[in-house]
Every structure is written in structure tokens, then in C-alpha cells.
Amino acid sequence: MKVRAILNPRAGLGARRALEDVRRGRPSWRDLEVKLTTGPGDAQRLAREAAAANADLVLAVGGDGTVNEAARGLLGSGVPLGIVPAGSGNGLARALGIPLSPARALRALEGALVRRIDVGTVNGVPFLNVAGVGFDALVGWAFHRAGRNGGRRGVLTYVRLSLALVRSYEPVPLRVEAGGEEFAARPFLVAFANGPQYGGGAVINPGARLDDGRFELVLYDDRPLLAILASAPRLFLGGIERVRGYRRIPTTRAVVTLERPLEHHRDGEPEPAALRLEIALLPRALPLLVPRTTAEDPSGPFTPPA
């Protein structure tokens, strides 16, 4: 099997160990080539080149940003993507039940099945798991800047930044068109969720299916600071959908028009400010390598066979 591994050496936790594990390879991956990224856009380019060179499988070794880029390079090629988590959030890997240890992830993927997942787009740019605008995007930008300036990455940094920013955060009024509804709102955040969770294990869209031909537009209303802080543990402990102010709308398309331009994110990666966000879906557009236990779990993130 011809395998190309695309590794971001700056992805964060576990990247160096992942490089060693991937180089060692698995018995069924005799023809394994490792390519290192050096900057934004490299993973997408390397994945596209791998598909053009008739690779049988591309492995994205890194965080959610590396996975997103590699997937963009493979869209339309039919070449499946495997995820070896080596970042700080690893949202999609967690949703797929892929072990966070690179060595264990490689073992799990060796006997994995191929499942096709839906791919969302924000203003035409793909995301796989969760995109959004509002407080989560603000924290994502701060997290990105902290990492770029040499700060520590990881869930604790994300929590620290969230606590620092939440006190002064002012939501922006916006207008939503989704699921046959149109309404004005001033939410704390709006998430466009194809998958169930952010990186770090924070579940924003419980019960999500990655292949059901729709995404969920999730709104969390602006509430008093203490109420927001009190509800935050629900993201990790379960039950966020029962929190007052939480609402989700299943849809295949949405438009969010903001009162003023605001930054957003795709799979945790910061995107520049925009006044209008158009979200759409590409049904089952990406073949993905999924651990067998997850692929066959009727309560997992894939639609059970009829």
C-alpha cells in the first residue's frame, strides 16, 4: 500500500513522537513516505500531490488545522484520509474514537474501515468538524496568537484564555437564515457543527452524525456571566443541550449576517473578519479511515446501515 504521511512538526503535543512512530510504519504500509510541512497551505499541497501520485492513503499527523488542510487537498480525489492526532485539540480524532497516542492511533488505523463523511463549507472554504463565529472564534484567535508567540498549547491554555476573555466579551447582533427559519439574535456564540465536539473534548453537538447529509447550527444565547460559567462544565460532562439558552437547528444551508464584521473559525483555525457567512454542505465528500469499533457502533458518529 502506497502511503504518504504529512506531518506538522510544530503541531503541538506529541508531534516529535508521532514522527518517529510514522517513520517506523506498520507492516501493511511498506511503501511509506513522510513529508514535513513548513507553513500554512503545505498540508493541502502535499495531499494534492499525493493524490496525483496515486497514493492509496494519506495520513495527516498533526492537529485539527493539519487535518483540515490535508482533507482540502484530497477532496474529489477519492483517496482516503487517516488521522494521527498530534495537536492540542484533536477534535475530529476524538469524535472518531482515534487514540490520542500516535503509536496507538497507528495501530487502530491499520485495521480501520473507510467511511465517507460530509464536509461543510464557510464562504466556500471547507471544514470537517465544527466552525463558528462569536466567543469560540475569539478564543481561537487568542489561542492561535499565543502559539505563534511561543506560548504553551493545550486544553489548559484554552481554558485560561476563555476565562480571561469571557468577562469583557460583548456579543454582536446578527441575523440567521437556517432550516426554513429567519430571525435576529445576539448570541454568545454560533457553531456550525458537522461533528459533535470542539477540540479538547468539549461536546457542543451531542449525537451528531458525520454522514447524515446535514449539519446543526447551534446557538448559545448571551446570558449573565455566572450562568455562562456555570454551564461550561456541561460541555465536558454532558447535557449541554439541556442548558437554558442552547438551541440547534438541523439544516443543509445557513446564512449568518452580522451587524459588523467579525472573525470566525473553521475546525479551530482562525479566519479573518467577515460580515456575511454562508454555510453549505458537501454530502459524504471525504473518505476517512475510521477505527472499526467506531465505524460499527450504532450509537457512534455514523448513520447505522438500514
Residue ranges, per PLM feature:
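ATP/nucleoside-binding phosphotransfer catalytic cores, i.e., glycine-rich phosphate-binding loops
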Residues: 5, 178-179, 184, 209, ...
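Short Gly/Thr/Asp-enriched flexible loops that form oxyanion-binding sites at enzyme active sites
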Residues: 66-77
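Glycine-rich phosphate/pyrophosphate-binding beta-alpha loops
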Residues: 132, 136, 191-204, 270
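ATP/NTP phosphate-donor binding region
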Residues: 1-58, 68, 295-306
